[in-house]
């Protein structure tokens, strides 16, 4: 057994203290023959500190495309030649999407908008949408609408938004290579305000943007410092017309190593499968991740890419004897 896994068994599994950056890097560098042991340990950590339940979430885009930022991985940027065009979703369609999400057994519905930050129109739409969903659907409402002011944070709290997603996307040292229209520090400031407001913080990123293994370890350590309630792990699904559109996808074994490493860095955090897993991991890899530290999934489609059918994921959870987290448990 590699020394880092022996260390993690005592430090993380028994004592609940996550690995530091050096420890995460050691896990990311484990040879293939030790990957099953790393995944098994990560699963034990998840079961010990989070329990067997899996949180299920659906997402929908209130405003798609036309974003002024230049995130190099994103087909919703108005600066690139991707086929995505700006579209607004009306409130009845938003409510219907929430109803369909709830029917899958999901406990959370996240409203997303492709913006730098919300303007007055978007805040009005969000307020109307959240109120309409709360009136008709028994589901928690989360939001992801970019960088916020303190006033906007307070408004979201007043609306009853229980969790806010704002991804750092990658580590601080690599961020300028994928975004130039705003800074990593600006994103961190929004997350600070959200945390202080009492809303739950959801913050993760995308692996496979061109970062080094060392930078993946840096990213895990920075997320652990933030200590978010939830970390969504995306794997790059290269989008045509974007600067990263010709990048190779993350190798499946590297993705699984990252899942184990991030779990060992953050033993108590909800670690959620997000975009790109279908391409990077397929069905077998998805199962391996759920047995290697993952304890939440986004079901259905993503913002601009297709996901797995919700029934496929729910059948997999049933097959693995992993109960879906009940709504009452998240209130």
Swiss-Prot record:
Cross-referenced NCBIfam families: bioB
Catalytic activity: (4R,5S)-dethiobiotin + (sulfur carrier)-SH + 2 reduced [2Fe-2S]-[ferredoxin] + 2 S-adenosyl-L-methionine = (sulfur carrier)-H + biotin + 2 5'-deoxyadenosine + 2 L-methionine + 2 oxidized [2Fe-2S]-[ferredoxin]
UniProt binding sites for [4Fe-4S] cluster: 67, 71, 74
Stated name of the protein: Biotin synthase
Organism: Salinispora tropica (strain ATCC BAA-916 / DSM 44818 / JCM 13857 / NBRC 105044 / CNB-440)
Gene this protein is translated from: bioB
Cofactor note text: Binds 1 [4Fe-4S] cluster. The cluster is coordinated with 3 cysteines and an exchangeable S-adenosyl-L-methionine. Binds 1 [2Fe-2S] cluster. The cluster is coordinated with 3 cysteines and 1 arginine.
PANTHER family: BIOTIN SYNTHASE (PTHR22976), BIOTIN SYNTHASE, MITOCHONDRIAL (PTHR22976:SF2)
Record-linked InterPro entries: Aldolase_TIM (IPR013785), BATS_dom (IPR010722), Biotin_synth/BioAB (IPR002684), Biotin_synthase (IPR024177), Elp3/MiaA/NifB-like_rSAM (IPR006638), rSAM (IPR007197)
EC assignment: 2.8.1.6
A Pfam family recorded for this sequence: Radical_SAM
Transmembrane feature ranges: none
Family recorded in the similarity comment: Belongs to the radical SAM superfamily. Biotin synthase family.
SMART domains: BATS, Elp3
UniProt-listed GO biological process terms: biotin biosynthetic process
Key words, A-Z: 2Fe-2S, 4Fe-4S, Biotin biosynthesis, Iron, Iron-sulfur, Metal-binding, S-adenosyl-L-methionine, Transferase
Binding site for [2Fe-2S] cluster: 110, 202, 272
